[in-house]
């Protein structure tokens, strides 16, 4: 059953000034009274444009207009949930002891090849094995560096709680999840990754660990073929 989006938006805009927007209530005001679960899905899709965030109880409230405060970014490791997402793909391809034996040797060799390619300023190409090697080599340092790059924005009050991000050449996702973890829980992000290589498979697994208000879309195409206007 579909939802009349115009009626949904009008109802949500009215209720936001009164109380949290609850799909269990909103459906009663809509034509054909669609199931609350359908209304919730539609609200999630409309949340960014409405300026809403979803709470743990499934209701929606306006996003604060206050800029993001400095979170005191000092990571000591790549968070376990993202590390596991990469490790699961390694186990799927090579088995539980992926870091030893022939598979471990091949991964280390691919890392050395990637480093040599970077050093020469050449363009790297990524098949599945290279993507996994890339994730192993760059995961932690790219994660940490991204947060430090955001600090100057928060120092100046320039990082809003509602963000639309276009990440061209998104790689295996460390910068994306660093942004997710850097932001407060009441932030809302519409994140679009442009990644044509096998890195996108690792990226998809890592992004699956992000929260409900970090909406993600992966565009598996080249930067040249991608239309930035398509993301709104």
For the regions a protein language model found, what residue spans apply to each?
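Conserved SAM-binding motif I beta-strand of class I
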Residues: 187-196
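N-terminal auxiliary segments of SAM/dcSAM-dependent transferases
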Residues: 24-32, 38-121
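Class I SAM-dependent methyltransferase Rossmann-like catalytic core
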Residues: 121-156
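Conserved class I S-adenosyl-L-methionine
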Residues: 160-171
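Active-site catalytic pocket residues across diverse enzymes, especially alpha/beta-hydrolases
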Residues: 153, 157, 183, 207-210
């Amino acid at each position: 059953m579909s939802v009349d989006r115009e009626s949904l938006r009008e109802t949500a805009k009215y209720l936001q000034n009164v109380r949290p927007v609850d799909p269990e209530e909103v459906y009663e005001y809509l034509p054909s009274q669609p199931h609350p679960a359908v209304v919730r899905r539609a609200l999630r899709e409309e949340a960014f444009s409405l300026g809403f965030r979803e709470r743990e109880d499934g209701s929606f409230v306006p996003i604060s207009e206050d800029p993001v405060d400095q979170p005191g970014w000092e990571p000591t490791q790549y968070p376990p949930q993202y590390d596991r997402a990469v490790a699961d793909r390694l186990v799927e391809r090579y088995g539980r002891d992926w870091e030893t034996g022939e598979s471990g040797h091949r991964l280390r060799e691919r890392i050395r090849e990637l480093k040599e390619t970077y050093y020469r300023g050449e363009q790297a190409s990524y098949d599945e094995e290279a993507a996994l090697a890339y994730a192993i080599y760059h995961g932690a340092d790219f994660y940490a560096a991204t947060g430090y790059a955001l600090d100057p924005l928060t120092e100046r009050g320039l990082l809003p709680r509602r963000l639309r991000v276009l990440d061209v050449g998104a790689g295996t996702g460390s910068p994306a999840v660093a942004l997710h973890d850097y932001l407060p829980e009441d932030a809302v992000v519409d994140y679009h990754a442009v990644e044509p290589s096998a890195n996108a498979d690792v990226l998809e697994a890592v992004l699956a660990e992000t929260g409900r208000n970090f909406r993600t879309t992966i565009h598996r195409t080249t930067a040249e073929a991608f239309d930035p206007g398509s993301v709104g």
